[in-house]
Amino acid sequence: MKALFLIGLLALVASTAFAQYSEVVGSYDVAGGGGAQQCPVETKLNSCRNYLLDRCSTMKDFPVTWRWWKWWKGGCQELLGECCSRLGQMPPQCRCNIIQGSIQGDLGGIFGFQRDRASKVIQEAKNLPPRCNQGPPCNIPGTIGYYW
């Protein structure tokens, strides 16, 4: 049982360390009042994604002590801070699409979330910009486009 726990813990740490990188691939134009704005097509805001999906442990928070309840909550605050910082670097008209794209792949498919869990994540995603003091809530569709 201990071996299984250690393997699971190592897998969590490895996946968290791997998921801490962001990548921008291409862009598309968003028509605006003064001309077109460039928005990233595929921006992986892993800090926002991990925060919204309650994947809050980070390598910096790996416990030196076995008091897991102390480092787990700190990881959530750290991820939220990094998420807000990265959202602040995005053009305001692109933020909601980027937030939606960050979680969309995790909400559907054969191994997707249960409906109530997905609804909670979507609601959190909608409220992420105001939580970061970066504008009004997003208009992300509730269950449209997801597989149940």
From Swiss-Prot:
It comes from Triticum aestivum (Wheat). Transmembrane segments: none annotated. One of its GO terms (molecular function) is nutrient reservoir activity. GO terms for biological process: defense response to bacterium. The keyword Transmembrane does not apply. The keyword Protein biosynthesis does not apply. This is Puroindoline-A. SMART domains: AAI (SM00499). Five disulfide bonds are present.
